[in-house]
Amino acid sequence: MTELTAATPTKRPATATDYVNLMKPRIMMLVVFTAVAGLAAASGMTGITMHPAMAAIAVLAVALGSGAAGAINMWYDADIDAIMSRTSTRPIPSGAVPKEEALTMGLIMSGVSVMLMWLASNWLAAALLAFSIFYYGVIYTMWLKRATPQNIVIGGGAGAFPPVIGWAAVTGNTPLDAWILFAIIFFWTPPHFWALSLLAHKEYAKVSVPMLPVTHGAKATRFQILVYTLVLIPVSLAPLATGLGGWIYGAVAGGLGLVFLAYAVAILRSKAGDDGAPAGDMKLARTAFLFSILYLFALFGAVLVEHAAGLHFPVFGA
């Protein structure tokens, strides 16, 4: 890896927004949403319910855990964040929040989140939350991200735990249905993030982060986006077979899955990520990236609506 150098940031007063941004709020929203969907699905499938106050505390614990992992990630990645234009305005490289303060915040929030989850639910949910924080903050951030082009594939497990945590908080166990929700996020992560990496591959190359377009080229990345999309679609339909997903979920997963596949095929045929790629091809990659976020929200939104609103009518399962 080449030596990283960046200008020392000029200290500026930190604002509340800086501390919120340190927790990666956009990621936190998706994490919390999928956890709530897992919680609702567990209740709907088993008939077990949590006291509303305990459920709210469990969701808060997930949010704090996500924020903790984000702060630890920003602490460790401050050196490369300062060099990449996409991340140079983050709280640490911009000089608003000292690195040590970000780490302290992340560690304290980690402990508080796990303790709250344990008090509100059970040891299994707390242990899964602790592991997911460790997975993202240490395994992915400190090891995989700068070590292998499979960083997103293996590291994607960190972001796939929230629905499992939500399920465990309700029932104290993690059956097949919980792991199906895990698998949906796990296989969604590579095509989602690689679409972004096609746009930012020069930035990653500049800081020697071995994202797939940097190590294997844009063409190979475009192909892998299609491969993982082809895996994701049947995985996303698995809830229909177990009874976890009903007619609403099936319509959403089937319809949006076809759109996702269309984007993947279009990206494969494009020059997105190549040097001198047409602006339209790069716009396609960005649109696919944004659509993938909508796709995941819609899938888990369908799970949430079916089980929380009494609209769960299984297609095949009991």
UniProtKB/Swiss-Prot annotation:
Record Pfam families: UbiA
UniProt GO MF annotations: protoheme IX farnesyltransferase activity
Subunit structure as annotated in this protein's UniProt entry: Interacts with CtaA.
The keyword Translocase is assigned to this record: no
One GO CC term, this protein: plasma membrane
PROSITE patterns, A to Z: UBIA (PS00943)
One of the protein's GO biological processes: heme O biosynthetic process
EC number: 2.5.1.141
Sorted UniProt keywords: Cell inner membrane, Cell membrane, Heme biosynthesis, Membrane, Transferase, Transmembrane, Transmembrane helix
Transmembrane segments: 27-47, 52-72, 103-123, 124-144, 152-172, 179-199, 225-245, 248-268, 288-308
Note: Carbon 2 of the heme B porphyrin ring is defined according to the Fischer nomenclature.
Keyword Cell membrane: yes
Source taxon at top rank: Bacteria
PANTHER family: 4-HYDROXYBENZOATE SOLANESYLTRANSFERASE, PROTOHEME IX FARNESYLTRANSFERASE, MITOCHONDRIAL
Location(s) in or outside the cell: Cell inner membrane
Membrane topology per record: Multi-pass membrane protein
Biological or metabolic pathway of the protein: Porphyrin-containing compound metabolism; heme O biosynthesis; heme O from protoheme: step 1/1
Predominant cellular place of this UniProt entry's protein: membrane
Biological role: Converts heme B (protoheme IX) to heme O by substitution of the vinyl group on carbon 2 of heme B porphyrin ring with a hydroxyethyl farnesyl side group.
Family recorded in the similarity comment: Belongs to the UbiA prenyltransferase family. Protoheme IX farnesyltransferase subfamily.
Name of the protein this chain belongs to: Protoheme IX farnesyltransferase
Residues in the signal sequence: none
Catalytic activity: heme b + (2E,6E)-farnesyl diphosphate + H2O = Fe(II)-heme o + diphosphate
InterPro entries: Protohaem_IX_farnesylTrfase (IPR006369), UbiA_prenyltransferase (IPR000537), UbiA_prenylTrfase_CS (IPR030470), UbiA_sf (IPR044878)
